[in-house]
Amino acid sequence: MLNTLWEIREKVRDLSPLVVNLTNNVVTNFTANVLLAAGASPIMSEGVEEADDLVKIANAVVINIGTLHSRQVEYFKKAVYLANKYQKPLLLDPVGLGATTYRNETTFELLNSGNFTLIRGNYGEISFLAGNSAQVKGVDSQTSDFAAENLTEVAKRYKTVVVATGPVDYVIAEGELYLNRTGDIMLQKVTGTGCALTSLIGAFVGVIDEPALAALAALAFYGAASEKARKISAGPGSFLVNFIDSLYNLTKEEFLELTTEKVQGLR
């Protein structure tokens, strides 16, 4: 399996998929740099007027609700419609879902307005989507009692691939369940690493027709790069720089070493 995951990573570098990001203004720069380092081509867009032109040429479209406002929501709705119209992979990152009524209403409105290829969130966000309405304390909620059943519920309800990231990353789709245990805790010390991960998953989904396997490849690659970076970093500042470098220069040999016995397919 690990060799297959690396082949997907190489496809990203070879094909340089165009990822249209409708993301939040906290993470725009970091997300673009993550995509570039991995070999993808990012577009960071805020103007609904260019939606049709961009979605038409995209290999994937990523919606991130991190810094939510009404003008952005208008763009989100149009992007959902256009991605479905042009049959483009469409990903949702419901940042902070469960924290405010506005985020909750917007997320459910988007999910009910079209078909999403994949939803990625942390344990708290995915649990909320599944109907467990405990208050989410922040955008980095890592609820320790997360149950994999939450993914099954969300995947069935929205007919999509669901990715929940935390101490163990879960990927579920119909007939598929994967676990990933790569990743360093330093990722939690740099803002935007989850948001950038969703966009990176978009790049991987954009090069093969198996979104669950593509998501697993992105998770394993991202986590392995973070582990490599941590080894030569003194703290969050140097880690940030070293992480971008690791995404760029991680070798197959390093990937296989860092992912062995950390990636599983359960069915």
Swiss-Prot record:
GO terms for biological process: thiamine biosynthetic process; thiamine diphosphate biosynthetic process. Its cofactor is Mg(2+). ATP binds at residues 120, 165. It catalyses: 5-(2-hydroxyethyl)-4-methylthiazole + ATP = 4-methyl-5-(2-phosphooxyethyl)-thiazole + ADP + H(+). Pathway: Cofactor biosynthesis; thiamine diphosphate biosynthesis; 4-methyl-5-(2-phosphoethyl)-thiazole from 5-(2-hydroxyethyl)-4-methylthiazole: step 1/1. The keyword Kinase applies. The keyword NAD does not apply. One of its GO terms (molecular function) is magnesium ion binding. Pfam families: HK (PF02110). Keywords: ATP-binding, Kinase, Magnesium, Metal-binding, Nucleotide-binding, Thiamine biosynthesis, Transferase. Its EC number is 2.7.1.50. Substrate binds at residues 44, 192. Catalyzes the phosphorylation of the hydroxyl group of 4-methyl-5-beta-hydroxyethylthiazole (THZ). Belongs to the Thz kinase family. This is Hydroxyethylthiazole kinase. The lineage of its organism: Bacteria, Bacillati, Bacillota, Clostridia, Thermoanaerobacterales.
